[in-house]
Amino acid sequence: MATTKQKVTAPSSSTAPCCPSTSILRREATAAVAGVGDGLQNWNNVPSVDDKQKKTASSALASLASTEPLSSNTSTKGIQIMTRAQTCHPLDPLSAAEISVAVATVRAAGETPEVRDGMRFIEVVLLEPDKSVVALADAYFFPPFQSSLMPRTKGGSLIPTKLPPRRARLIVYNKKTNETSIWIVELNEVHAAARGGHHRGKVISSNVVPDVQPPIDAQEYAECEAVVKSYPPFRDAMRRRGIDDLDLVMVDPWCVGYHSEADAPSRRLAKPLVFCRTESDCPMENGYARPVEGIYVLVDVQNMQIIEFEDRKLVPLPPADPLRNYTAGETRGGVDRSDVKPLHIIQPEGPSFRISGNYIEWQKWNFRIGFTPREGLVIHSVAYLDGSRGRRPIAHRLSFVEMVVPYGDPNDPHYRKNAFDAGEDGLGKNAHSLKRGCDCLGYIKYFDAHFTNFTGGVETTENCVCLHEEDHGMLWKHQDWRTGLAEVRRSRRLTVSFVCTVANYEYAFYWHFYQDGKIEAEVKLTGILSLGALQPGEYRKYGTTILPGLYAPVHQHFFVARMNMAVDCKPGEAHNQVVEVNVKVEEPGKENVHNNAFYAEETLLRSELQAMRDCDPFSARHWIVRNTRTVNRTGQLTGYKLVPGPNCLPLAGPEAKFLRRAAFLKHNLWVTQYAPGEEFPGGEFPNQNPRVGEGLASWVKQDRPLEESDIVLWYIFGITHVPRLEDWPVMPVEHIGFVLQPHGFFNCSPAVDVPPPSACDSESRDSDVTETSVAKSTATSLLAKL
């Protein structure tokens, strides 16, 4: 379910910025004209050029200022120079202005006033363009200004005079008709109002999607809670449990999933979970410490009516737990630690990364940042600058596209707790405004995110994405034992992250980029357990007792990473394949007389049905995405390998109802041939979805070839959570993830050119730490007992 969070209403959409400032754009244009090819660029200093090129640069800047195109014969090194047709890169997230235009265009296109009044806006996102459009933008209009991305002809590069207009994709729910529709809007003149004109958008298409329910919105959750709390039979049920103050009651609406025809998407439904706080004057009290059970409520969310209600069983409220709270001064008897000294991260010369709009350069990495209400953070166009080999692509698009949380208790209400937190709700639209010094440390660049609310207004989550560098311990080291001489390098990584809250749980999503060419995907899980109440003396084996009358059910968390790979592939090329590697033990015999032999065996995954695979730690199984036409210095194909971390498969039986919608959980790895529209493993609309195996499990039935293709990896990774007492009242972070690691991609370690640490002191000694500064032991009997 969605959570209430602070958002900032966007300023007037006509002035909302979309992309980099004019000065940055001018520096970029100058750099493009100066013919800086595929190398790393310094946008603060225009590279030196000869007189002819300087004149060309001046002409380009003048043209940019006047917005008139250059003459066709204006060129540098044979490349025609064109002005920007737009100030937003084709992959930049929609600006607040663009969202406003898209909403206004769709609303104006409603056939009748009733249709327009019933429109509710679930999602407004960028319709990502074809990869050829991205290649054009990256070649001549935006960083990295890599003209080699474009196909060549006998007459030179073909360069259109402008980029095509951006488009928005809207999911619209009509509250009056219970219909869901998808609209495509072309954003022609978004910022015209700033120049005294009008906003303009053009409807390209609109289609009603039958038999679906879109994600439930935060406004619907809030209205649902109010409806339930005002329902007289519900209030009577609360009084029977000794609850007279309804302000203490928390109603968390959950999507119903699909268990039977009663959950069909012909109705928009929610089944709430109910909790009760203890204190009316404590806004940060842990209200999840007292679940209210035995009450069954079914809400028609379309009409905001309770259509089924039953007080089935009187389960006593769990007692107030003195250890339930987690705010400062209220934990473990009200005593906080006093021996934590400040730790400062200082970068006196600033960060090593450079930014232009949503384009990032760091060390030898470059990529773009995107953001959607459903996925949250998206990483586009990942590439590595590899010396004389230039900018080498690795991936087109990386994101987390779904997560599923099934619970293992067969009793009501826990058996129906099977949340699809991305598809039923949205990871991005539940993202936090991050705080410096709390969520991220160091020199930080934040990115805001713009969303539509339920009624079509624009809201902005400030500081939604955090970009910063981190020290990550040792990168490599060797000491010559003969001479005693040593070389050591410290590892630094660039981290891009966001954090979201979905009801009681928090999820933090990270993409880490390393100096050795490695990419790590990480999820950190924290927040509060979803608890259940017990009868006096009751014990339930499907969870952990937190205190008498209160227990935490076992459950699993599954995440789906979608990775459209592009290892050494330019846009338009489909030269990747996937091999599975298993380490095998050699049979005893002539080849293994010492009985010590083992070797890595590779198997090419030739088609989609063959590429449904599971992790196997006993054979060190991993998978390599290789380019079929590029080799390293040994003649082997270049590649990147997916290295699994800790993982699991669903523990529910094969007939479990939630697996109807989550058939993709049956394997850890799926590989598909890229196809537009195949974006979410459970299909576009998993909420109340009655269709078995929609999405990934259906797409692979085509069994498309993978031997040389545009490859999409779907990696499903999960964790089985058997709760501990130490997970209460708020869970310490659990880590889960995987790594993309170069495998024959480079000719040697790309980390050998990292310079030595500037503060490396061969005469090591304590940092002025004396015996007197050691913290004295605390002899607090209360702390000792706790």
UniProtKB/Swiss-Prot annotation:
UniProt signal peptide: none
Enumerate the Pfam families for this protein. Answer: Cu_amine_oxid (PF01179), Cu_amine_oxidN2 (PF02727), Cu_amine_oxidN3 (PF02728)
Where does the record say this protein resides? Peroxisome
Residue(s) at site: Microbody targeting signal: A784, K785, L786
Q: Which cysteines are joined by disulfide bonds?
A: C440-C466
Binding-site residues for Cu cation, renumbered to this chain? H555, H557, H721
Q: In which pathway does it act?
A: Alkaloid biosynthesis; nicotine biosynthesis; Amine and polyamine degradation; putrescine degradation
A GO molecular function annotation here is: putrescine oxidase activity
Enzyme Commission (EC) number: 1.4.3.-, 1.4.3.21
Superkingdom of the organism of origin: Eukaryota
**Cofactor info, note text:** Binds 1 copper ion per subunit. Can also use zinc ion as cofactor. Contains 1 topaquinone per subunit.
Share the record's PTM remark: Topaquinone (TPQ) is generated by copper-dependent autoxidation of a specific tyrosyl residue.
Binding, Mn(2+): D710, I711
Q: Where does substrate bind?
A: 419-430, 502-507
Gene Ontology biological process terms in this record: alkaloid metabolic process; amine metabolic process; nicotine biosynthetic process; putrescine catabolic process
Tissue expression pattern? Mainly expressed in roots, and, to a lower extent, in leaves and stems.
Q: Which cofactor does it need?
A: Cu cation; Zn(2+); L-topaquinone
One of the record's GO cellular component terms: peroxisome
Catalysed reactions, as listed in the record: a primary methyl amine + O2 + H2O = an aldehyde + H2O2 + NH4(+); N-methylputrescine + O2 + H2O = 4-methylaminobutanal + H2O2 + NH4(+)
The main location is other
Q: Which UniProt keywords apply?
A: Alkaloid metabolism, Copper, Disulfide bond, Manganese, Metal-binding, Oxidoreductase, Peroxisome, TPQ
Read off the InterPro entries from this record: Cu_amine_oxidase, Cu_amine_oxidase_C, Cu_amine_oxidase_C_sf, Cu_amine_oxidase_N-reg, Cu_amine_oxidase_N2, Cu_amine_oxidase_N3
What's this chain's function? Involved in putrescine catabolism in peroxisomes. May also be involved in the biosynthesis of pyridine alkaloid natural products, leading mainly to the production of anabasine, anatabine, nicotine and nornicotine, effective deterrents against herbivores with antiparasitic and pesticide properties (neurotoxins); nornicotine serves as the precursor in the synthesis of the carcinogen compound N'-nitrosonornicotine (NNN). Oxidizes preferentially non-N-methylated amines.
**Can you tell me which family this protein belongs to?**
Belongs to the copper/topaquinone oxidase family.
Subunit structure and binding partners: Homodimer.
Task: Write down what this protein is called.
Answer: Diamine oxidase [copper-containing] 1, peroxisomal
Q: To which species is this protein native? A: Nicotiana tabacum (Common tobacco)
Task: List the gene name.
Answer: DAO1
